[in-house]
C-alpha cells in the first residue's frame, strides 16, 4: 500500500500515519521480513490464476483472505483507518485501468477483457509486514496497455538496481523517471514508496522521480518499498469520494509494480521476489 508524499499539496491530511525516525533492521528482523515478503509474493502468484474476464474484485479479495488465514497471516489493510479516513474495507487493493491505487474490492466490479488490474497486498506475519503489488493483463489488452505495464515493471527494476550503500534516494527516482519518460509515460508524484518493518509505513519516503545525488544516503539495514505508478497521460490525480480510491485526472490508464527491498552491505536484496 502506497504512502502519500508529504510534500504533496493534493490533500491536507497526511496519508497514512507513520512511525518516526529512521529504522535499521537487524539480521534477526530481516529473517522475519524475508518470510513475510515471500508469503506476500506467493499470494500474488496464487491470485494471478483468477485474473480473467468475469471475475469480481470481491472474489479476488475473498480468496486472498482465505489464503492468508490458511498461511497464518493477516491483512494489514483491512480496517486500516488513518485519522480522517474511513476504515479500508478490503483485505487487498484492486485497482483497474484508470485507478492508480487503493481501489476497494467490490462484488459489482467485474473484470472485463482488455482491462489491466493492479493487485496490492500487504501481509502481517509475526509482527512484520510484507508489501508487494503487480499489474496483470486481463485477456487481450491494447498495445498501449501492454507497453505501459511492461514499462512500469522495468522502471521499478531500474530503480532497484540503483540501491546500494552510499547511493542516494534521488538516484532511485531519477532512474525510474528517466526510463518512464523515455517510454512515453508520466510518473505519479503524489504517491511514494515507504519504509516498512514492524509498521506498515515508517518515516522513510522513496519518491519515484527526482535528481541523482539528492536525498538521504542509503545505509545497510534500511528496508523500504519501491513502487512506481506510471500513467498513460498526465501524472495528476483525483481522489474519489470514498476517501481511498485514486484515479488519473484525465481518466487514462495507470499501472504499478512494487517490491519490498533491503539495503545490504553488497547492494540490495528484494524481499518479495516470487
UniProtKB/Swiss-Prot annotation:
InterPro entries: Creatinase/aminopeptidase-like, Pept_M24, Pept_M24_MAP, Pept_M24A_MAP1. PROSITE patterns: MAP_1 (PS00680). One of its GO terms (cellular component) is cytosol. Its cofactor is Co(2+); Zn(2+); Mn(2+); Fe(2+). It comes from the Bacteria. A divalent metal cation 1 binds at residues 120, 131, 258. A divalent metal cation 2 binds at residues 131, 194, 227, 258. One of its GO terms (biological process) is proteolysis. Binds 2 divalent metal cations per subunit. Has a high-affinity and a low affinity metal-binding site. The true nature of the physiological cofactor is under debate. The enzyme is active with cobalt, zinc, manganese or divalent iron ions. Most likely, methionine aminopeptidases function as mononuclear Fe(2+)-metalloproteases under physiological conditions, and the catalytically relevant metal-binding site has been assigned to the histidine-containing high-affinity site. It is an enzyme of class 3 (hydrolase). The keyword Transferase does not apply. Substrate binds at residues 102, 201. Its EC number is 3.4.11.18. Keywords: Aminopeptidase, Hydrolase, Metal-binding, Protease. It catalyses: Release of N-terminal amino acids, preferentially methionine, from peptides and arylamides. Pfam families: Peptidase_M24. GO terms for molecular function: initiator methionyl aminopeptidase activity; metal ion binding; metalloaminopeptidase activity. Disulfide bonds: none annotated. Monomer. Removes the N-terminal methionine from nascent proteins. The N-terminal methionine is often cleaved when the second residue in the primary sequence is small and uncharged (Met-Ala-, Cys, Gly, Pro, Ser, Thr, or Val). Requires deformylation of the N(alpha)-formylated initiator methionine before it can be hydrolyzed. HAMAP family: MetAP_1. This is Methionine aminopeptidase B.
Amino acid at each position: 500500500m502506497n504512502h502519500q508524499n508529504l510534500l504533496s499539496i493534493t490533500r491536507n491530511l497526511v496519508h497514512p500515519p507513520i512511525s518516526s525516525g529512521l529504522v535499521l533492521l537487524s539480521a534477526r528482523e530481516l529473517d522475519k521480513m524475508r518470510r513475510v515478503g515471500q508469503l506476500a509474493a506467493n499470494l500474488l502468484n496464487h491470485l494471478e490464476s483468477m485474473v480473467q474476464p468475469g471475475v469480481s474484485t470481491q472474489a479476488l479479495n475473498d480468496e486472498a483472505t482465505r489464503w492468508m488465514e490458511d498461511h497464518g497471516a493477516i491483512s494489514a489493510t483491512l480496517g486500516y483507518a488513518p485519522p480522517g479516513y474511513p476504515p479500508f474495507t478490503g483485505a487487498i487493493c484492486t485497482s483497474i485501468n484508470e485507478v492508480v491505487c487503493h481501489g476497494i474490492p467490490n462484488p459489482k466490479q467485474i473484470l472485463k477483457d482488455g482491462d489491466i488490474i493492479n493487485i496490492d497486498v500487504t501481509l502481517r506475519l509475526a509482527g512484520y509486514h510484507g508489501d508487494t503489488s503487480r499489474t496483470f493483463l486481463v485477456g487481450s489488452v491494447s498495445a498501449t496497455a501492454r507497453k505501459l505495464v511492461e514499462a512500469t515493471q522495468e522502471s521499478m527494476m531500474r530503480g532497484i538496481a540503483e540501491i546500494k550503500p552510499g547511493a542516494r534516494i534521488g538516484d532511485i527516482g531519477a532512474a525510474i523517471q528517466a526510463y518512464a519518460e523515455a517510454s512515453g509515460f508520466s510518473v505519479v508524484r503524489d504517491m511514494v514508496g515507504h519504509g516498512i518493518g514492524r509498521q506498515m509505513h515508517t518515516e522513510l519516503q522513496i519518491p519515484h522521480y527526482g535528481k541523482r545525488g539528492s536525498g538521504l544516503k542509503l545505509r545497510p539495514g534500511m528496508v523500504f518499498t519501491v513502487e512506481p505508478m506510471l500513467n498513460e497521460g498526465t501524472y495528476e490525480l483525483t481522489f474519489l469520494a470514498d476517501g481511498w480510491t485514486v484515479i488519473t485526472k484525465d481518466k487514462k490508464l495507470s499501472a504499478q509494480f512494487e517490491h519490498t527491498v533491503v539495503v545490504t552491505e553488497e547492494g540490495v536484496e528484494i524481499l518479495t521476489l516470487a
